[in-house]
């Protein structure tokens, strides 16, 4: 199934200009947080334009939302709280201004204690929630490895393991079976955890020791075992800390159960309850998630200025502006859009997850022959989900009309800026990071 997008309606008019300005301001703010190399003094983003070429979107699957999308944000309650806020806004003048001000990170209370744990032993920076057309990223910083060989007995039938079988109920209890579309036939189930969420049986990829790791496995394991007891050394009595590997996790459970019989741990540990789990939204039959293949090769534009420092005749003697104009890019990725109550969650998948999900039917791209038209050989299409595959950039140095370019760091500056653009996109939009629209 394909979708026709009225690109002019989305990007044109005053609303389109406002969206472009928000994106420009967001990218500019992110560049101000980046540690610049010594030869660059500053980077400024001046303009952003969507261009006239729309992306190509193809629906690949319709299924249940990912478990992470059900996690509650304590600063922004669910629809019952939203209705109460709307009533209060109608009754109290100026209440809407206070609610809008809450989207400004400088006006919001600290959320260090409310940061989402992604099962990686570190807290990522919290995002911002924005009213209606504004967005909120949920961004963990890193993606460590974790392995899991089998399900614990208490995890069978857990709502956080949609593919796990519930005793006595064939096929499990998920309200929508992920094997219902043909695209899942090409999934081996041993590629990534997201393949299990989007089409493979859970126990298959859990039993495969060679499965690549993503944070979804640890995320689901933590959600399913939040009621178990963990052991914390007396020298570190932080109840919020928890084991970061399966070995430590299982060892803690074994010692916890042994301590219940002996009254004390033989290693001098004290038994403390694990951190309370995040409150999860209740699942509804109306919840839906759409998996799409997004391709774009257009004339999107962005203008940046990087100030290059000259070290002659002395270090950092003078700065010369280098203007970079991004005039287009090529994009290929798999996007997820989930609608749960009054929230729409959006993200892209990493190349490994995307290839495991929808890459099985697009690997062959015809035959190619040599110059004499002989020796045909198959041509493999590039792996799906490569995200930002190519960025077109033009550079201008100093004032116009000089006609000379004598700086040696121009290539380094271009490479640095483009790499940061890629990194900003991957950090903000690639799962397990996602954005939330309040609709």
UniProtKB/Swiss-Prot annotation:
It comes from the Eukaryota. Component of the ER-mitochondria encounter structure (ERMES) or MDM complex, composed of MMM1, MDM10, mdm12 and MDM34. A MMM1 homodimer associates with one molecule of mdm12 on each side in a pairwise head-to-tail manner, and the SMP-LTD domains of MMM1 and mdm12 generate a continuous hydrophobic tunnel for phospholipid trafficking. This is Mitochondrial distribution and morphology protein 12. GO terms for cellular component: endoplasmic reticulum membrane; ERMES complex. One of its GO terms (biological process) is mitochondrial genome maintenance. Belongs to the MDM12 family. The keyword GTP-binding does not apply. It is a peripheral membrane protein. Residues 109-121 have a biased composition (Basic and acidic residues). Residues 69-90 have a biased composition (Acidic residues). Its main location: mitochondrion. InterPro entries: Mdm12, SMP_LBD. It comes from Pyrenophora tritici-repentis (strain Pt-1C-BFP). Component of the ERMES/MDM complex, which serves as a molecular tether to connect the endoplasmic reticulum (ER) and mitochondria. Components of this complex are involved in the control of mitochondrial shape and protein biogenesis, and function in nonvesicular lipid trafficking between the ER and mitochondria. mdm12 is required for the interaction of the ER-resident membrane protein MMM1 and the outer mitochondrial membrane-resident beta-barrel protein MDM10.
